[in-house]
Amino acid sequence: QQNSYYIAEHYLSMGYHVLTPDLRASGLSGGRYLTLGYRESEDIVLWAKRVAEFYPQAKIVLHGVSMGAATVMMAAGREDLPSEVVAAVEDCGYTNADELIAMQMENSFGLPAFPAMNLLNWRCEKVAGFNLHDAAPIDAVRHARVPILFIHGTKDTLVPPNMAEQLYAAANAPKKELLMIPGAVHAAASQADQQTYFRTIRKFVQPYMEEQK
């Protein structure tokens, strides 16, 4: 959440209002289980709709980091995304959860993807009611309804940089841009090169925030 506040401060400095909700099963939000962005994307859409109810002239930019980025990408591809959402910024999100977890199992614990992933998926379905295959931002961005800015650090060892390239290539957004931050590790691009990070965001989102409805 500290990272969220750091980023929020920069949006505030651009003159925007900021809402930083905790995702389900995190912080002050309810729920028992994370779904790696799958059901969280439903929550974000509901938050956006709620904002639009109170502020009919609102223009909303979704910004997420890591799992938040996966959530934002999946929200961007949802048919029920409200028209008040005009752009999205994803920072170090993954292509799909099952591929990422399988890779980390092998790299960090030396476990083969099979049968470990089958067992994990069975457990997720039984306990949390979702399939890891459902958490697939790369499928969502193929149906993106808003412009997306993709950001990733070149030294990210948790979510490999090539995932950002795959997401960018797959995205069928009205507009898209890819920013790679040299030397940045996972979820630290905004600190590694603050000037480039926020300058690029401002340049990307500003035209959509200033458009007349």
List where the protein language model places each region:
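Short alpha-helix in the alpha/beta-hydrolase fold that links the catalytic acid
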Residues: 137, 146, 160-169
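Short beta-strand/loop motif that positions the catalytic acidic residue
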Residues: 143-145, 150-152, 156
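Hydrolase active-site cap/lid region
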Residues: 74-130, 139
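Catalytic histidine neighborhood in serine/cysteine hydrolases
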Residues: 169-187, 194
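Catalytic active-site module of serine/aspartate enzymes centered on a nucleophile-bearing elbow/loop
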Residues: 192-213
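Acidic catalytic loop of the alpha/beta-hydrolase fold
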Residues: 155-159, 187-188
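The serine-hydrolase catalytic nucleophile loop
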Residues: 1-10
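Alpha/beta-hydrolase active-site loop
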Residues: 34-55
